[in-house]
Amino acid sequence: MPVISMKQLLEAGVHFGHQTRRWNPKMKKYIFTERNGIYIIDLQKTVKKVDEAFNFMREVASDNGTILFVGTKKQAQESVRDEAIRSGQYFVNHRWLGGTLTNFETIQKRIQHLKKIERMEADGTFEVLPKKEVVLLKKEQEKLERFLGGIKDMKGLPDALFIVDPRKERIAVAEARKLHIPIIGIVDTNCDPDEIDYVIPANDDAIRAVKLLTAKMADAIIEVNQGEELTEAEVAPVEEKATEETTEA
């Protein structure tokens, strides 16, 4: 049984592509028809591709891998942040800083600087500093948090990227490809699907469509993690029983 239904996709407007004059011919195989100058995406193919992406997400999560959610366009910012947090992963939902992946050491230095400012605020250092200096530090903190807050606890490079609109996030795509990090992407009719390992052909401009698909990818991670918790809960009583029996013996 597919992880997402045609009805859900239709209700969220996933099938609406871009205007016919704004398209990438490589997306032809994912297009069902054209209506009033707009391409209509073949949702049967979307259902299948969501399944493939969902299963890959589960694989990554099963190996304790990390996934970086990326979506800096207005329609994606909230969903990308909320679903990454909900699934215990990382996100970039404002401007992608060049070198986020390919120059990870430098990015880490900026993150350490952000954490240093946070410690200064927490331990009372701000109270003994001149007001002007505190204002500047707070501005810097706000800026760093905006761009790096979603990855400040990410210890190393992610094992996969989930991207909303690879065309807009082309720098993130290029960096991931250079480092051979697999990409799952919500790909509209104006994108190049060849750059994406797991293509989800869909409307990347409708908030409801983006939210539905991003949440579904997060669900894959949560399912795996909840499964692990359940297994541990089931194993604990067995171990306790075995210990009791050994003690009695």
Curated annotation (Swiss-Prot):
- Quote any Pfam family the record assigns: Ribosomal_S2
Q: Which domain of life is it from?
A: Bacteria
> What biological-process terms (Gene Ontology) are attached?
translation
Is Phosphoprotein given among the entry's keywords? no
Keywords per UniProt: Ribonucleoprotein, Ribosomal protein
Q: Which SUPFAM superfamilies match?
A: Ribosomal protein S2
A GO CC annotation recorded here is:
cytosolic small ribosomal subunit
The GO molecular function terms of this record are: structural constituent of ribosome
Q: HAMAP family in the record, alphabetically? A: Ribosomal_uS2_B
Say which family it is in: Belongs to the universal ribosomal protein uS2 family.
The protein's name: Small ribosomal subunit protein uS2
Q: Which organism is it from?
A: Listeria monocytogenes serovar 1/2a (strain ATCC BAA-679 / EGD-e)
**Gene for this protein?**
rpsB
